[in-house]
Amino acid sequence: MKTVLAFLFLPFIAFTHAESYEDVKEEIKNEAEKEIFEDLEEESDALDSSVREFNDAKPWRFRRAIRRVRWRKVAPYIPFVVKTVGKK
């Protein structure tokens, strides 16, 4: 939506402030490129943050495995494991 409004509003601004047709074309082209690059930067920032999350999984694999354990299902067996290990 932002890009559509820019394309509708920018020619009006360009025609009111430009000296010639070539200046109008150049100004519209520059503004359109600027909008496109801003949109691409926003999208790349979102993609970079999600890529970091996926790449973080390797160093923390053991930690994530511990987090995935269903502690409510495992908790009843903890006293048995402690007794067994303590008998050595």
Curated annotation (Swiss-Prot):
Residue stretch(es) of the prosequence: 19-57
Subcellular location: Secreted; Target cell membrane
Record GO cellular component, one term: extracellular region
Keyword Ligase in record: no
Valine amide modifications at: 85
Main location: secreted
Tissue distribution of the protein: Expressed in entodermal epithelium along the body column.
Signal peptide: 1-18
Keyword Transferase in annotation: no
Keyword line: Amidation, Antibiotic, Antimicrobial, Immunity, Innate immunity, Membrane, Secreted, Signal, Target cell membrane, Target membrane
Assigned protein family: Belongs to the arminin family.
Known function: Antimicrobial peptide with a broad-spectrum antimicrobial activity. Shows very strong bactericidal activity against B.megaterium (MBC=0.1 uM), E.coli (MBC=0.2 uM), S.aureus (MBC=0.4 uM), methicillin-resistant S.aureus (MRSA) (MBC=0.4-0.8 uM), vancomycin-resistant enterococci (VRE) (E.faecalis (MBC=1.6 uM), and E.faecium (MBC=0.4-0.8 uM)), and extended-spectrum beta-lactamase (ESBL)-producing enterobacteriaceae strains (K.pneumoniae (MBC=0.4-0.8 uM), E.coli (MBC=0.2-0.4 uM)).
Name of the protein described by the UniProt record: Arminin 1a
Source organism (scientific name): Hydra vulgaris (Hydra)
